[in-house]
Amino acid sequence: MAVYAVDHPLVKHKLGRLRQSDVPVAEFRALSNEVCRLLTYEATKDLETEKTQVEGWAGPVEVEQIKGKKITVVPILRAGLGMLDGLLDMIPGAKVSVVGMFRNEETLEPVTYYTKLANNIEERQAIIIDPMLATGGTLVATIDLLKKAGCKQIRGLFLVAAPEGIKRVQDAHPDVDIYVAAVDDCLNENGYILPGLGDAGDKIFGTK
């Protein structure tokens, strides 16, 4: 398993704004999608392509296109929806698979309440999106679910991640790569990332 912290001035600038406590809901949504676009660019560098011929303005042209069944994006509800448009802007043909989970605030373990996966998911690469990788429990459970459905190629995109969550995923699924805008310091006693973003779901949906 590899962890890629995307080191880019635009990512750093936008993430810095996301961390501010007074950022408006509309701006938080926009920034989340903007950072997701930049992460998507990095996370898809190794996609396999194939040559094909298309009709150009001056005749046939040989071009390269992504090979195979391509991508399914997997937003973890609800906060993952805040990054969905950003990824679909980059890969508009991606199929969307939805996983609904919430974290039990007493045990900090995930509870699954909804699943709808793309057809032929065993032939696709799944990209899981969620603003925060905290304890890692939700991500491990999502990967378990995808692998049980036959998916073999999985990676995750996150705005921020805690070292504790990264280690948990590494131990459970060493074949899954993670792309993140920043690896933060630690989790607090309640399982929240420090310095983190606060409650990303509330900030995206304007709830408290």
From Swiss-Prot:
In terms of domain of life, where is this protein from?
A: Bacteria
Q: Which CDD domains does the entry link to?
A: PRTases_typeI
Q: Which positions are annotated as binding 5-phospho-alpha-D-ribose 1-diphosphate? A: R78, R103, D130, P131, M132, L133, A134, T135, G136, G137, T138, D199
Q: Which cofactors does the annotated protein need, by name? A: Mg(2+)
* Family the entry assigns: Belongs to the UPRTase family.
Q: Could you tell me which HAMAP family the record lists for this protein?
A: Upp_B
Q: What is this protein called?
A: Uracil phosphoribosyltransferase
Organism name: Oleidesulfovibrio alaskensis (strain ATCC BAA-1058 / DSM 17464 / G20)
